[in-house]
Amino acid sequence: MLEQEENGLFEIPDYEHVEDETFPPFPPPASPERDPADAEPEEGSGSGVPVPPKRTVKRNLPKLDATRLTSERGLPALRHVFDKTKFKGKGHEAEDLKTLIRHMEHWAHRLFPKLQFEDFIDRVENLGNKKEVQTCLKRIRLDLPIVHEDFVNNNDEVGEANGPDVSATGFDPFLTSSSDSRKFASEPTRSLTEEQQQRIERNKQLALERRQAKLLSNSQSLENDVTVEENSTGEDQEESNGLNIDTADGPHDVPFASTHEEEQCKAEETQLDHTNLD
């Protein structure tokens, strides 16, 4: 503590022969908390290492191209945009046009909100010549599936059409029993041994041989029956031909015999008449 003098003043020490204290330099204003060891080397010093430039990562901005136009929110979504809208019809053409344009603007904004509606129409008109867009339009006109949801819905409809009726199978015990019997019948076939399989094949071959022998015997008997029928038909034809010849000869002789008998009868009558007269 400085001693106070009698007149109330403090004694001032001599600072002329005292050396000043050294302090480190201040950091640059851009980085106030930076250490001096990490400070950038000066340009004049040749020992400085060149600092690589900073890389800027660019974001891929969305573009209105053919793939975006044919996506789920693109042209396929137009099929269902006007499902719930009702147009007034004749006499209200202006109002109907306004509603149509309003729905189209909403569709365009959902697909690509960065463009105005006029610019969007120009861009879509230019993309109309692309092959992808034309194929998408053809599939829409032919009512073919385009998006994944369309394929899923078609598969569900086909499965419902081909699948059994749940109401019928729920109350019909025979259907369930038949399916269970098929399962039980398929299980023992898997557990067959080689000897059993060979025995089954032998039985099949024996059955086939027996069947072929039976077919041969049946064919031979049929051939014999055919020959017998042909012989019998030949005999019948000969008999019928003989009868036809007899009938053809008979009618020519009959009139001669009848006329001869008539003449004899007349001669006898004349003789009787003469005897009566005598």
Swiss-Prot record:
Give a Pfam family name: Swi3
Q: Where in the cell is it found?
A: Cytoplasm; Nucleus
Ranges for the region named Interaction with TIMELESS are 64-140
- Point out residues bearing the modification Phosphothreonine: T233
What tissue expression does the UniProt record report for this protein? Expressed in brain.
Query: What are the BP-aspect GO terms?
Result: cell cycle phase transition; cell division; DNA damage checkpoint signaling; DNA replication checkpoint signaling; mitotic intra-S DNA damage checkpoint signaling; positive regulation of cell population proliferation; replication fork processing; response to UV
Point out residues bearing the modification Phosphoserine. Answer: S191, S219
Q: Which UniProt keywords apply?
A: Cell cycle, Cell division, Cytoplasm, DNA damage, Mitosis, Nucleus, Phosphoprotein
Region annotation (Disordered) maps to: 1-59, 155-197, 216-278
Q: Where is the composition biased (Acidic residues)?
A: 226-239
Query: What GO CC terms are in its UniProt record?
Result: chromatin; cytoplasm; nucleus
Q: Where is the composition biased (Basic and acidic residues)?
A: 259-278
What function is annotated for this protein?
Answer: Plays an important role in the control of DNA replication and the maintenance of replication fork stability. Important for cell survival after DNA damage or replication stress. May be specifically required for the ATR-CHEK1 pathway in the replication checkpoint induced by hydroxyurea or ultraviolet light. Forms a complex with TIMELESS and this complex regulates DNA replication processes under both normal and stress conditions, stabilizes replication forks and influences both CHEK1 phosphorylation and the intra-S phase checkpoint in response to genotoxic stress.
How does this polypeptide assemble, per the annotation? Interacts with MCM6 and MCM7. Interacts with TIMELESS (via N-terminus), which impairs TIMELESS self-association. Interacts with RPA2 and PRDX2.
Annotated family: Belongs to the CSM3 family.
Please report the name of this protein according to its UniProt entry. TIMELESS-interacting protein
Q: Which organism is it from?
A: Mus musculus (Mouse)
